[in-house]
């Protein structure tokens, strides 16, 4: 019935909202417990910015952070690029809420047509493409002179369109026309 569909869609919105807050509360722990971001609100903001691929940051001396924190920061954006949506789609059926309701809560625009008859298969295809794009960019950045660590972090944040960097000056730090071309060339 129509009322049942609205109720399920509302459930999807609530579950997505709770998932974002929950992931961010747990995701802020490395920053806060490690003392790298001593304010709870700042640590939460940095994490929410990562998981939402927003790219806003409260950090003003990025290069002073240890590699583990920089990797976690990049990973939050990579996970946020697609991960939370598809994790939720894969896990929610266990709790009796279908993945389509959650997809509708996250998707913009009309959602009358299904992406694929089986959302799980679609999610696997999208994850494969996402991982492939990330891997390709890692190789291209290493080829351009970035360290493996910086290449991984930048590929994570670029693929997700979040834009966090391991350097205060972002890609300008490298003074590389090749790297700039990778970031500015049309797809």
List the model feature ranges, each with a label.
Residues 26-80, 143-185:
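P-loop potassium selectivity filter motif centered on the GYG triad
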Residues 117-150, 156:
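Long, contiguous internal "core" modules enriched in hydrophobic/ aromatic residues
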Residues 98-119, 155-165:
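Juxtamembrane inter-helical linkers in multi-pass membrane proteins
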Residues 8, 12, 66-73, 110-122, ...:
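Membrane-helix interfacial "entry" motifs
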Residues 8-21, 120-132:
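Alpha-helical transmembrane segments and their helix-start/interface "positive-inside/aromatic belt" motifs
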Residues 76-98, 185:
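Transmembrane alpha-helical segments in integral membrane proteins
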Residues 1, 24-28, 88-91, 133-142, ...:
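Hydrophobic core segments of alpha-helical transmembrane domains in multi-pass membrane transport
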Residues 2-10, 183-187:
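Conserved small/polar residues in nucleotide/adenosyl-binding loops
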């Amino acid at each position: 019935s129509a009322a049942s569909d609205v109720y399920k869609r509302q459930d999807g919105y609530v579950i997505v909202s709770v998932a974002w807050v929950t992931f961010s509360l747990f995701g802020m722990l490395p920053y806060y417990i490690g003392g790298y971001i001593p304010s709870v609100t700042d640590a939460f903001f940095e994490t929410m910015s990562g998981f939402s691929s927003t790219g806003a940051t409260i950090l003003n001396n990025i290069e002073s952070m240890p590699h583990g924190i920089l990797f976690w920061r990049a990973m939050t954006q990579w996970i946020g690029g697609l991960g939370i949506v598809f994790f939720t789609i894969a896990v929610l059926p266990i709790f009796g809420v279908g993945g389509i309701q959650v997809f509708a809560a996250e998707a913009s625009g009309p959602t009358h047509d299904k992406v694929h008859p089986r959302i799980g298969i679609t999610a696997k295809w999208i994850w494969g493409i996402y991982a492939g794009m990330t891997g390709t960019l890692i190789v291209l950045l290493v080829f351009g002179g970035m360290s493996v660590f910086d290449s991984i972090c930048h590929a994570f944040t670029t693929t997700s369109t979040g834009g966090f960097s391991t350097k205060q000056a972002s890609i300008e730090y490298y003074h590389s026309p090749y790297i700039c071309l990778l970031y500015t060339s049309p797809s």
